[in-house]
Amino acid sequence: VQKKPFNPILGETFEATFLHEKDPTKDIQLFVEQTSHHPPISSYEAQGHNFRLHGYCGYLASIRGNALKGGQVGPTYIDFESDGATIHYSQPFLWLKGICWGERVLEYYDKMAFTENKNNLECEVVFNPDQKSFIGSFFSSQKTPVDFLRGEVKKDGSVIGVIEGSWLGVVHYYPGQTADSLSSMKDKEKVEVSRKEIFNIAKEVPKYAKPSDDPLPSDARFREDAVALRSGNLELAQTKKEELENKQRRERALRKTGSSRNSLASNQSGSEKDLIEATQN
């Protein structure tokens, strides 16, 4: 019998550390909490050397024929101690093609929007910017691969440079260029102009989070269904999973019945309410 996966429980937490290879002062502490059950919303914070990344996200997914479209919906912020600047950015969406038949392919699409108000900086990175329409693809081929991305960096509304490259390869920043000036260059010419490598998948070492040795009692590792599953007792795991889900439904009904102007539900921030409405639509 097909069993449903374990879904996060409201209030469930997880703590871990991304360990730096050489300098422990550059370790990154990670904290995650499930802050909404319906729709599911996860809040997160990563504290590192002179920076703090934090935000929350809901999840959207829809099936279109032989493809799955999905992504995270919600803001992410990075605060820097050095100058007090904060970068806000959004996540791109994903296409997972070939879910039922054919070759399975994962692609980013749409865009990421970055803003930094202290220095009046912004950048909109577009994934697969030269994508052809279904009809257009019959008449001409696309000049850039599907993993290509491009974005103009602006300061005070004026373009000061371009980010361009492949999220499966190398991404460069070209100061003083525009999207038009760069797209008119041949690959050989791009090598000769001033540029800075800002991402190289061959150089990026995967980071693994080491779970906390002293987590909160609400840590995901203490869930009774997960403990039973790890021990190989599938029947007990399913029973405990159903108990947790039923308890969560009862508590949600109580919160809904007892909500008032003074309740937590009525005191949600405007951005959280917008996110909940977006995931429900």
Protein language model annotation of sequence segments:
Residues 1-281:
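Extended acidic, Ser/Thr- and Pro-enriched interaction/regulatory segments
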